[in-house]
C-alpha cells in the first residue's frame, strides 16, 4: 500500500484525533493540538460518511468541546479550524468558527495596559542633529540603527552621532526623501555598547579610540559628514 503525503497527513490527524477523544473520555483536559485534532478528525469522518452537509458540520463542530474539556487558555487560542474534507460529491473546506466557547478566564499573551501615557526613553539625554539626504533615493532609518553608520548619502555631523540611535519608539523609522533636510533627536545606545555589523565602521567597543578609527573609515569610504583628523596616524586592520 502506497499513500500520498496528503493521505499520510490525514491518517496522522485521525490518530491524533482518536487519542484526543480517548483522553477526553478519561476526563483529561485537552491541550491546543489535541483540541484541534479532535474537531478535525470528527469532521473528516462525518464528511466521509456522507450523511451531513458541510454547513451542518460547521455547526456541529462547535458542539464537540466545552470550555471545561480543555486547559485554561486553549479556547481563546482557537479562533477557527479549517478542514479539507472529502464528501461524496468532492472535497470541500469546512471552517468551524469559534469551536470552543471561551469563559474569558485566561487568554495567553493578553496585555493589561494602564490608562496612562508611556514615556519612551525616559531619563536619556537627547541631542539634535540636522540631516540632509544628498542622494537621489529615499533613505529610511530604523529606531535602533547606529546612526553614525547610516547611508553614506545622508550628510550630517557623524562625530556627534557616534554611539547613538534615534529617539523614537522601537520598531518605527524616520524617512528622508531626496534633497530633504530635517533635524532628528538622538540618544545613546544602551547595553554594553559593543557595536557590530551595520556598515562595519566600528565592529568593537564604542569608545573614543574606536570613534577615531570609525571616522577615518567613514571618510575613506565616502560617508558624507565624516571628518577625520588628517594628523591622526594609526594602522587599521580591515
Swiss-Prot record:
An annotated Gene Ontology molecular function: nickel cation binding
Predominant localisation class? cytoplasm
Task: Name the top EC class.
Answer: hydrolase
Q: Which GO terms describe its biological process?
A: urea catabolic process
Q: Which GO terms describe its cellular component?
A: urease complex
Sequence segments annotated as region (Urease beta):
103-238
InterPro entries xrefs: Urease_beta-like, Urease_betasu_sf, Urease_gamma-beta_su, Urease_gamma/gamma-beta_su, Urease_gamma_sf, Urease_subunit
By its UniProt entry, which Pfam families does this protein fall under?
Urease_beta (PF00699), Urease_gamma (PF00547)
* Location of the protein in the cell: Cytoplasm
Alphabetically sorted, this entry's keywords are: Cytoplasm, Hydrolase
Reactions accelerated catalytically: urea + 2 H2O + H(+) = hydrogencarbonate + 2 NH4(+)
What is this enzyme's EC? 3.5.1.5
Please give the pathway this protein is involved in.
Nitrogen metabolism; urea degradation; CO(2) and NH(3) from urea (urease route): step 1/1
* Quaternary structure and interacting proteins, as annotated: Heterohexamer of 3 UreA (alpha) and 3 UreB (beta) subunits.
What family is it from?
A: In the N-terminal section; belongs to the urease gamma subunit family. In the C-terminal section; belongs to the urease beta subunit family.
Full protein name = Urease subunit alpha
What is the scientific name of the source organism?
Answer: Helicobacter acinonychis (strain Sheeba)
Q: Which gene encodes it?
A: ureA
Amino acid at each position: 500500500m502506497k499513500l500520498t503525503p496528503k493521505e499520510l497527513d490525514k491518517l496522522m490527524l485521525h490518530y491524533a484525533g482518536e487519542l484526543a477523544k480517548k483522553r477526553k473520555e478519561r476526563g483529561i483536559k485537552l491541550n491546543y493540538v489535541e483540541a484541534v485534532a479532535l474537531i478535525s478528525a470528527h469532521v473528516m469522518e462525518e464528511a466521509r460518511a456522507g450523511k451531513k452537509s458541510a454547513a451542518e458540520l460547521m455547526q456541529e463542530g462547535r458542539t464537540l468541546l466545552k470550555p471545561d474539556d480543555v486547559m485554561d487558555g486553549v479556547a481563546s487560542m482557537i479562533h477557527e479550524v479549517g478542514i479539507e474534507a472529502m464528501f461524496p460529491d468532492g472535497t470541500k473546506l469546512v471552517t468551524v468558527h469559534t469551536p470552543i466557547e471561551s469563559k474569558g478566564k485566561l487568554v495567553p499573551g493578553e496585555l493589561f495596559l494602564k490608562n496612562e501615557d508611556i514615556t519612551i526613553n525616559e531619563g536619556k539625554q537627547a541631542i539634535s542633529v540636522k540631516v540632509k539626504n544628498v542622494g537621489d533615493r529615499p533613505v529610511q532609518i530604523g529606531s535602533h540603527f547606529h546612526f553614525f553608520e547610516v547611508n553614506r548619502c545622508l550628510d550630517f555631523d557623524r562625530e556627534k552621532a557616534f554611539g547613538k540611535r534615534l529617539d523614537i519608539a522601537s520598531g518605527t523609522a524616520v524617512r528622508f526623501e531626496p534633497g530633504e533636510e530635517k533635524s532628528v533627536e538622538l540618544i545613546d545606545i544602551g547595553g554594553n555598547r559593543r557595536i557590530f555589523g551595520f556598515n562595519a565602521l566600528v565592529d568593537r567597543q564604542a569608545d573614543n579610540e574606536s570613534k577615531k578609527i570609525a571616522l577615518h573609515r567613514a571618510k575613506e569610504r565616502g560617508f558624507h559628514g565624516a571628518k577625520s583628523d588628517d594628523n591622526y596616524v594609526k594602522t587599521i586592520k580591515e
